[in-house]
Amino acid sequence: MKNILFGVRSTVAAALVFGLSHAAFGATDLTVYTAVEAEDLKKYAARFNEDHPDIKINWVRDSTGIVTAKLLAEKENPRADVIWGLAATSLLLMKGEGMLHAYAPSGLDGLDSKFRDKSDPPTWTGMDAWVAAICVNTVESEKHNLPTPSSWEDLTKPVYKGHVAMPNPNSSGTGFLDVSSWLQIFGEDGGWAFMDALHENIGHYTHSGSKPCKQAARGEVAIGVSFAFRGAKSKASGAPLEVIIPSEGIGWDMEATAIVNGTKKLDAAKTLVDWSITEKANKMYNEGYAVIGIQRLAKPVEHFPDNIPQAMIDNDFEWAASNRKRILAEWQKRYDSKSEPKS
């Protein structure tokens, strides 16, 4: 009888322990920092929760530059558990500061080699590539007799004076990939000379990478230097836009994922990072991006220019990350006078 009672008690105790541990894990909240487009956050969390309903994502979202600055400021007292959707150049900077937890997620071998940190184990893994593009409002261009630009150099022609908006690279990852890629395409001296000439035609600099294209879509400017995802999405919504891939080539960066060093929720963080490189996740990224971490899964994206993979420059991410501070300081000194007020 004692054995039976002991067995019952043990079973009940085990069930309680299991229930409590399951409830505790079920209550796991992950603080996830991101620069993913705000409209996609609900979808990303919902798809993840289809497979892992026991982990709740609490998003902290802003533009790439602002999220990067926030993470660096919190280095000694990190508040994020995971970074899901931030520029690889930003993560390389944090890797150098010892801020990322090295982890080889399940399925790593299935990723394109460009979409992972070179360290073993890696500190970050890539999701998709976002690429520079020029968003041209055809109605506004016709109204102002503006020819459709086909190159970056075209944007320096006097005819475009006051009709161009682009992102401030101190706030925007898209702005930084533009600036760092121009310095690679044209060379250091040529890149700054190009930006000096472009600055003459800039109406204003924004603090968001998508905003110049959104403004072009609404007819607030004729031309927005932005990224292809936003142009394609605006065009699909009926905006009178052309998405132009400049002939010199385009800068690009990866949206990438990493675990923040020191998280107290490491198991849940690993679960999210594992999921972020699955085929299911990559198919989700492909709903908006033409180039993804598992490229064999990629299907054409509506209104994306066909020549994007060929136009992507051989971007030196290590160089961009190590020179980021210098580049941003120089840009700020030269051009910040035309930046919009920060909201």
Where are these regions (language model features)?
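Short, polar/charged alpha-helical segment
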Residues: 31, 35-58, 72
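Extracytoplasmic ligand-binding site segments that recognize negatively charged/polar headgroups
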Residues: 35-42, 65, 79-220
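Short amphipathic alpha-helical coupling segments at ligand-binding clamshell hinges
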Residues: 44, 190, 194, 255, ...
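An extracytoplasmic/periplasmic, membrane-proximal ligand-sensing/linker region
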Residues: 188-190, 293-343
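Periplasmic-binding protein-like
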Residues: 110-114, 159-167, 194-199, 205-206, 237-261, 276-298, ...
